[in-house]
């Protein structure tokens, strides 16, 4: 009898909550709205998509990407924007640093004509614009570049040298409290780019920290630490960077994995380079000395030549990528135009 009374009381409470706050304000975990598959947007890096465990950056969540200067933070964000646009998504870029290069973005595959861009005057304006775009439900990806450039209005209007302790941290904390619920409800991916600072007087442990206080660390579902690990040379010329990304926080899959890939100057993340590395690792591409082979046919001597061969034969590159994704159990949406190409008759001709 007590159990029946509890059930009736719970049913009455649920009905009252839905009446007061609207349908869907409380539900069981078995309801479709909660258990539907997580939607993701590719980072543009196959290796990083696999390291994230779900095939990309999760929609309806906050993501933080941080690292030293010139480590590839903006490149990674623009690649994610390009991937979202390929699937028909609408993207916005809040350029608080006033440093976005549209020519470079276009080289990475971003449709700059359709990209929404804002260059706000203050941190409050930037975050208010972000909140309004999220609440519109019409934008799929929003990039905020960067947290360090979100200067509070009081600091801009004050004198140079004035002390404004904790202003930016309070601004971020207040904004994220408002944003998080709307982001989840509208299934928007919001990416914050952040910079690194050094703590003063740290004797033990890591002296590095990110700007904007601790709020973003808590609210972010995914945090990526991106670093440049070396240069890529073609002869004496440096043509790109070796890059490593560590997944330091991940609420949608196991964290602490890392991804290594190449960023080529003027091109962005080298998809072909990743396919070669992962293809060899999973046994789809054979490597003998300097030669690489696929299905028993030689496709290139040295990584540079093999990369160029895969660029010239995108259908075969797509096929190898699909095999890699199937091998690790991670799939992702593919643009309708992809995969329809026929193999060239002379694709394997040496």
From Swiss-Prot:
Entry GO terms, CC: cytosol
Listed Pfam families: RecA, RecA_C
SMART domains in alphabetical order: AAA
Biological processes annotated in GO: DNA recombination; DNA repair; SOS response
Residues annotated for ATP binding in this entry: 67-74
InterPro entries listed in its UniProt record: AAA+_ATPase, DNA_recomb/repair_RecA, DNA_recomb/repair_RecA_CS, P-loop_NTPase, RecA-like_C, RecA-like_N, RecA_ATP-bd, RecA_C_sf
Localization per record: Cytoplasm
TM region(s), chain numbering: none
Keywords: ATP-binding, Cytoplasm, DNA damage, DNA recombination, DNA repair, DNA-binding, Nucleotide-binding, SOS response
UniProt-recorded Gene Ontology molecular function terms: ATP binding; ATP hydrolysis activity; ATP-dependent DNA damage sensor activity; damaged DNA binding; single-stranded DNA binding
Family according to the record: Belongs to the RecA family.
Classification via NCBIfam families: tigrfam_recA (TIGR02012)
Function text: Can catalyze the hydrolysis of ATP in the presence of single-stranded DNA, the ATP-dependent uptake of single-stranded DNA by duplex DNA, and the ATP-dependent hybridization of homologous single-stranded DNAs. It interacts with LexA causing its activation and leading to its autocatalytic cleavage.
Protein name stated in the entry: Protein RecA
């Amino acid at each position: 009898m007590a159990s029946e009374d509890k059930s009736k009381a719970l049913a009455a409470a649920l009905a009252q909550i839905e009446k007061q706050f609207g349908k869907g304000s409380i539900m069981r975990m078995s309801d479709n709205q909660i258990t539907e598959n997580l939607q993701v947007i590719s980072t543009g890096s196959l290796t990083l998509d696999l390291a994230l465990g779900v095939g990309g950056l999760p929609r309806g969540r906050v993501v933080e990407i941080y690292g030293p200067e010139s480590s590839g933070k903006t490149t990674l964000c623009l690649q994610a924007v390009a991937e979202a646009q390929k699937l028909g998504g609408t993207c916005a870029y809040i350029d608080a640093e006033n440093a976005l290069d549209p020519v470079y973005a276009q080289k990475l595959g971003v449709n700059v004509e359709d990209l929404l861009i804002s260059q706000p005057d203050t941190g409050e304006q930037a975050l208010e614009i972000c909140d309004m775009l999220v609440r519109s439900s019409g934008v799929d990806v929003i990039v905020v570049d960067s947290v360090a450039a979100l200067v509070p209005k009081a600091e801009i209007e004050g004198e140079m040298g004035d002390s404004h302790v904790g202003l930016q941290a309070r601004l971020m904390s207040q904004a994220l409290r408002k944003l998080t619920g709307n982001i989840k409800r509208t299934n928007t991916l919001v990416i914050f780019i952040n910079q690194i600072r050094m703590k003063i007087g740290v004797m033990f442990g890591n002296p590095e920290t990110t700007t904007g206080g601790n709020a973003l660390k808590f609210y972010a579902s995914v945090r990526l630490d991106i670093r440049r690990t070396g240069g890529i040379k073609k002869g004496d010329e440096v043509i790109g960077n070796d890059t490593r990304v560590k997944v330091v926080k991940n609420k949608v899959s196991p964290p602490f994995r890392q991804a290594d890939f190449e960023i080529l100057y003027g091109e962005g993340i080298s998809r072909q380079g990743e396919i070669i590395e992962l293809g060899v690792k999973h046994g789809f591409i054979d490597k003998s000395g300097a030669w690489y082979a696929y299905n028993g046919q030689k496709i290139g001597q040295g990584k540079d030549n093999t990369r160029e061969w895969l660029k010239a034969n995108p259908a075969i590159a797509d096929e190898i990528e699909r095999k890699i994704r199937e091998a690790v159990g991670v799939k992702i949406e593919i643009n309708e135009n992809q995969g329809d190409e026929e193999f060239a008759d002379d694709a394997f001709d040496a």
